[in-house]
C-alpha cells in the first residue's frame, strides 16, 4: 500500500493559491537566497509537522473507505515582505510600502482561509490563522514585513 503524500498536497495547495491570487508577487516555499529574493515576497515556511496529533491509530473513514489513521497537524509560518520601491496595482491604484503590506496581510489571510482542498486528495478538518506579528519597517533594509502562523489539520489515513 502506497502512502499518500498529504503534507505536499496541503503545501502545494497553499502555494498554488497564493501564486494564482498574487501573480505579481514572488511566492516561495522556503526562504530564498538573499540574491534571489524578489518583491513583494510571500514566503511559506513549514515549521512543524505532526502538531497536535489526535486519535493516533484509531478507526476513521476517508471517502468510502475505512481504516486506521489520525488527525495530523502542520504548522506554517507565512511571511510578507515589501521593499521600498515595490508596487502592486489594486483596482487601478498603485499600492506601495505600508499600504501594500496592509492590503496583503488582509487579503492573504482571506485567501488562505478560503482554500478548498480537494476532498479526494486530502480531508482538511480544521485550520487556524493566527494574528499577524512583527508588523513593521526595517529602515536599514528599507523593508516592510509581517509574519503569521497558519495551522492545518487533516485526516492522515494510513491503512485499511
Regions inferred by a protein language model and the residue ranges of each:
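Charged, amphipathic alpha-helical segments and their flanking helix caps
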Residues: 1-34, 49-160
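Short, well-ordered secondary-structure micro-motifs within conserved domains or adaptor modules
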Residues: 37-48
Amino acid at each position: 500500500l502506497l502512502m499518500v503524500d498529504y503534507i505536499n498536497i496541503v503545501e502545494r495547495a497553499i502555494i498554488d493559491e497564493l501564486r494564482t491570487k498574487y501573480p505579481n508577487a514572488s511566492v516561495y516555499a522556503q526562504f530564498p537566497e538573499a540574491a534571489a529574493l524578489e518583491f513583494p515576497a510571500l514566503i511559506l515556511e513549514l515549521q512543524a509537522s505532526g502538531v497536535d496529533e489526535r486519535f493516533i491509530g484509531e478507526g476513521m473513514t476517508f471517502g468510502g473507505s475505512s481504516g486506521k489513521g489520525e488527525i495530523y497537524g502542520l504548522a506554517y509560518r507565512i511571511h510578507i515582505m515589501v521593499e521600498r520601491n515595490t508596487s502592486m496595482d489594486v483596482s487601478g491604484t498603485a499600492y506601495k510600502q505600508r499600504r501594500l503590506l496592509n492590503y496583503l496581510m488582509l487579503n492573504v489571510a482571506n485567501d488562505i482561509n478560503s482554500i478548498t482542498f480537494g476532498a479526494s486528495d486530502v480531508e482538511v478538518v480544521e485550520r487556524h490563522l493566527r494574528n499577524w506579528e512583527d508588523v513593521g519597517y526595517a529602515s536599514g533594509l528599507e523593508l516592510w514585513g509581517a509574519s503569521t502562523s497558519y495551522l492545518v489539520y487533516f485526516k492522515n489515513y494510513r491503512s485499511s
